Amino acid sequence: MAKVEDLRQKSDDQLAEELVQLKKEQFNLRFQAATNQLEAPARIREVRRSIAQIKTLQNERAASAAKA
């Protein structure tokens, strides 16, 4: 899981790209869980939190851009 400080240094495009990758991983993890092939159940939680952190940063940036 990336730290928030590392995520803040990334550009909007990099964040969007990472978000897409995490959503793909989340889909694959859900599929593995449904078929009882999941080896690291904690990874689902990590991916979900990373997605939330990226979305939060994107919303913060959008709000600050709207104010400026």
UniProtKB/Swiss-Prot annotation:
Gene Ontology cellular-component terms listed: cytosolic large ribosomal subunit
Transmembrane segments: none
One MF term in the entry's GO annotations: structural constituent of ribosome
The keyword Ribonucleoprotein is annotated on this UniProt entry: yes
Keywords in alphabetical order: Ribonucleoprotein, Ribosomal protein
Domain of life: Bacteria
InterPro entries the record matches: Ribosomal_protein_uL29, Ribosomal_uL29, Ribosomal_uL29_sf
One Pfam family hit: Ribosomal_L29
GO biological process, one term: translation
Family: Belongs to the universal ribosomal protein uL29 family.
NCBIfam families: L29
Record protein name field: Large ribosomal subunit protein uL29
